[in-house]
Amino acid sequence: MNLEQIYKDCGAYLEGHFLLSSGKHSQFYLQSAKVLEDPKLAAKLCDELAKIIASYKIEFDSICSPALGGILAGYELARACSKRFIFTERVNKEMTLRRGFEVKKGEKFIICEDIITTGGSALESAKIIESLGGIVVGFAALANRGFCAVENLKSPRKDNAKLPENLPLFTLGNFEFEIYDETNCPLCKKGNKAIKPGSRGN
């Protein structure tokens, strides 16, 4: 499966100057909503991701995603795995569990995102689940931006990664884009203003 080509064909592989949800800057942005707006394609991708997870024989009960970007990917993955789905959401800048969702003590979760950059939002969701008595057994995403180690791709962990080293991350592919702090961003130095798409922007 050529994930990069799928993103390009869907108009989801964007070039410009972007402020990522992690606070970093990048010349490229992956707009997964453009991929997931096609239900058949969303199902195909998450069916494939479910097969990868199943091949590692990890036992889990439910899937949780951080809103907003992770909801479609998480729901489709839950469908493919025949598991329960819940989501966390940000209220006053803090991740929380609302809408009557509950976590049973000992319930095992995979945290699912559309894209994992440093893994900050996924880690926030994991901490919520664990604070309520759940157990996080792994992470999943359509794509990894190259910072977190991916179990099925055998890709290494980089310094910016926030996901726990002892839990696996499963994805369909890696996109290795350079990301920058605002202070050393070459696009900022050229006078270009970063726009804020995605989970914490428009």
From Swiss-Prot:
InterPro entries: OPRT, Orotate_PRibTrfase_bac, PRibTrfase_dom, PRTase-like. It is an enzyme of class 2 (transferase). Keywords: Glycosyltransferase, Magnesium, Pyrimidine biosynthesis, Transferase. GO terms for molecular function: magnesium ion binding; orotate phosphoribosyltransferase activity. One of its GO terms (biological process) is pyrimidine nucleobase biosynthetic process. Pathway: Pyrimidine metabolism; UMP biosynthesis via de novo pathway; UMP from orotate: step 1/2. SUPFAM superfamilies: PRTase-like. It catalyses: orotidine 5'-phosphate + diphosphate = orotate + 5-phospho-alpha-D-ribose 1-diphosphate. Orotate binds at residues 117, 145. Its EC number is 2.4.2.10. Its cofactor is Mg(2+). 5-phospho-alpha-D-ribose 1-diphosphate binds at residues 93, 113-121. Signal peptide: none annotated. Belongs to the purine/pyrimidine phosphoribosyltransferase family. PyrE subfamily. Catalyzes the transfer of a ribosyl phosphate group from 5-phosphoribose 1-diphosphate to orotate, leading to the formation of orotidine monophosphate (OMP). Homodimer. This is Orotate phosphoribosyltransferase. It comes from Campylobacter jejuni subsp. jejuni serotype O:2 (strain ATCC 700819 / NCTC 11168).
